[in-house]
Amino acid sequence: MLARFPLYLRLVRMDKPIGSLLLLWPTLNALWIASDGRPRWPLLVIFTLGTLLMRSAGCAMNDYADRDFDRHVKRTADRPLTSGKIRAWEAVAIAVGLSFIAFLLILPLNTLTKELSVVALFVAGSYPFMKRFFAIPQAYLGIAFGFGIPMAFAAVQDTVPMLAWVMLVANIFWSVAYDTEYAMVDRDDDIKIGIRTSALTFGRFDVAAVMACYAATLGIYVWIGVTLGFGLAYWAGWAAAVGCALYHYTLIKDRERMPCFAAFRHNNWLGGVLFAGIAVHYLLAGN
């Protein structure tokens, strides 16, 4: 068992934390806004650990769902499940176990948060199979990656205001942007194996679609900033996020694999500076 532990860590992408961060930033945004910049430490711990656990569970389930496809993709052919180093039932067991632990974390929270967690679990568990049916599965991913937003508002306020759903829509656009960049890396392989991705759906308009999704995301955050009366610190973070998006254009405009992958990874900075703007605004407002 111990000898297989490194394989399990690779299965749940513990060696690649970028995915966890892409889930964490919008969740932290929601926690900070819902609590007026003063989130309780227990909630921070619960949502941070829950994000890590559910992302890991999602990776295990994704590899299970894609095991017959991933062997035909150069980037994924050596994953533990695809290469036969671990078995399918192990991946499912890990996904179920991690999801159960994540659910245990939210047991002390209110009923609404627990009810939303059931929806979140369904969305996260069904996403890996959406690539068979949806032309833009990345939009569904945005719901899965962003469901911590309404859950955070529910945990803090015991209600989910319209603002939370607007933030979720922003996250959907952001997810389509960065995961299209990710899909551009595997475009040729995905054509061969018949997987549906936004990069294939957008075709020659893929770069324009990515930038339009960034514009929609950041446009919604303009509305959020104006509606909540955020100050200079927030707008500095927003401007830095705009700079990140423009930098991504320089990486993806030629549609080369490695620059597109670099753009995907760089979204950690885009999410991070947006959160920093929100956090610093509340820090200054409280002094």
From Swiss-Prot:
Q: Which cofactor does it need?
A: Mg(2+)
Q: Name one GO cellular component term.
A: plasma membrane
Q: Which domain of life is it from?
A: Bacteria
Query: Which UniProt key words apply to this protein?
Result: Cell inner membrane, Cell membrane, Magnesium, Membrane, Transferase, Transmembrane, Transmembrane helix, Ubiquinone biosynthesis
Q: Where in the cell is it found?
A: Cell inner membrane
Question: Has UniProt tagged this entry with the keyword Cell membrane?
Answer: yes
Known catalytic reactions: all-trans-octaprenyl diphosphate + 4-hydroxybenzoate = 4-hydroxy-3-(all-trans-octaprenyl)benzoate + diphosphate
Which pathway does it serve? Cofactor biosynthesis; ubiquinone biosynthesis
Q: Where is it mostly found?
A: membrane
What are the transmembrane regions? 41-61, 89-109, 133-153, 158-178, 202-224, 266-286
The protein's matches in PANTHER family, at most eight in alphabetical order, are given as:
4-HYDROXYBENZOATE POLYPRENYLTRANSFERASE, MITOCHONDRIAL, PRENYLTRANSFERASES
What does the record give as the function of this protein?
Answer: Catalyzes the prenylation of para-hydroxybenzoate (PHB) with an all-trans polyprenyl group. Mediates the second step in the final reaction sequence of ubiquinone-8 (UQ-8) biosynthesis, which is the condensation of the polyisoprenoid side chain with PHB, generating the first membrane-bound Q intermediate 3-octaprenyl-4-hydroxybenzoate.
Q: What is this protein called?
A: 4-hydroxybenzoate octaprenyltransferase
* Taxonomic classification: Bacteria, Pseudomonadati, Pseudomonadota, Betaproteobacteria, Burkholderiales
